Amino acid sequence: MGSREEELRFILHDLGVGPYFLGTFDKHFPGFISKDRMSCAIVNTAGRETGGVHWLAMAWHPASQTFYMFDPFGFSDQKLKQIYNFEYQGLLKRSALTSTADRCLTLIQSTQSVQGPNSAACGLFCCMFLHAFVRWPLRAMDNNPTMNLIHGVPNNMLESPSSQNVFLRNQQNLYRFLRRHSPHFVKHAAQIEADTAFDKMLTN
């Protein structure tokens, strides 16, 4: 099942992301329309009519002209298009960010996998990343107290048996992090953990 949109919004409010959060969107997300406002969003790789497939987090930091694209699986744009028919480069072209004075911006994309291949916790990992973004926007992807709680492996090792213990520890640390910071998660922990379980895709 994974995470519901309303649930992600409640958790992000608890994490202090609310003032910067534009909302949850399907693959038709129009982009960051205001180039002068620090903002972020959680975007699904599928259309809303499908019920959703995989959550990504996107964030814009105008002071440094930095666009973040966080995928818990660490897929490249080419791989996202191949698997989900989703392109973030196309999203960038639709966005007002390309109308900046010199059209010069820095794209920082996650390239390592932090989520197991059968886990349904992608939305929760996105919440964790956005917590880091609003606090440390210049080093949101790593080298901060939030993202240091999880560890990545090269995307080509996503299915490797040697990676699964790393992913399991990441998900356990993710739940621990949310228990500390989100009253909504604490109140609904049993249901949320069942919906986003490490082996959820095997049991569907």
Swiss-Prot record:
Biological source species: Bovine adenovirus B serotype 3
Protein name per its UniProtKB record: Protease
Up-regulation conditions: Expressed in the late phase of the viral replicative cycle.
Active site, per annotation: H54, D71, C122
Further remarks about this protein from its record: All late proteins expressed from the major late promoter are produced by alternative splicing and alternative polyadenylation of the same gene giving rise to non-overlapping ORFs. A leader sequence is present in the N-terminus of all these mRNAs and is recognized by the viral shutoff protein to provide expression although conventional translation via ribosome scanning from the cap has been shut off in the host cell.
Entries under Pfam families matching the protein: Peptidase_C5 (PF00770)
Catalysed transformations (reactions): Cleaves proteins of the adenovirus and its host cell at two consensus sites: -Yaa-Xaa-Gly-Gly-|-Xaa- and -Yaa-Xaa-Gly-Xaa-|-Gly- (in which Yaa is Met, Ile or Leu, and Xaa is any amino acid)
Regulation: Requires DNA and protease cofactor for maximal activation. Inside nascent virions, becomes partially activated by binding to the viral DNA, allowing it to cleave the cofactor that binds to the protease and fully activates it. Actin, like the viral protease cofactor, seems to act as a cofactor in the cleavage of cytokeratin 18 and of actin itself.
Family from the record: Belongs to the peptidase C5 family.
Function: Cleaves viral precursor proteins (pTP, pIIIa, pVI, pVII, pVIII, and pX) inside newly assembled particles giving rise to mature virions. Protease complexed to its cofactor slides along the viral DNA to specifically locate and cleave the viral precursors. Mature virions have a weakened organization compared to the unmature virions, thereby facilitating subsequent uncoating. Without maturation, the particle lacks infectivity and is unable to uncoat. Late in adenovirus infection, in the cytoplasm, may participate in the cytoskeleton destruction. Cleaves host cell cytoskeletal keratins K7 and K18.
Site (Cleavage): G51, G52
GO cellular component terms given for this protein: host cell nucleus; virion component
Gene3D superfamilies xrefs: Adenoviral Proteinase, Chain A
GO MF: cysteine-type endopeptidase activity; DNA binding
Coiled-coil residues: none
HAMAP family recorded: ADV_PRO (MF_04059)
Biological-process GO terms, alphabetical: proteolysis
Source organism superkingdom: Viruses
Keyword NAD attached: no
EC code: 3.4.22.39
Keywords, alphabetical: Autocatalytic cleavage, Disulfide bond, DNA-binding, Host nucleus, Hydrolase, Late protein, Protease, Thiol protease, Virion
Oligomer and partners: Interacts with protease cofactor pVI-C; this interaction is necessary for protease activation.
Subcellular location: Virion; Host nucleus
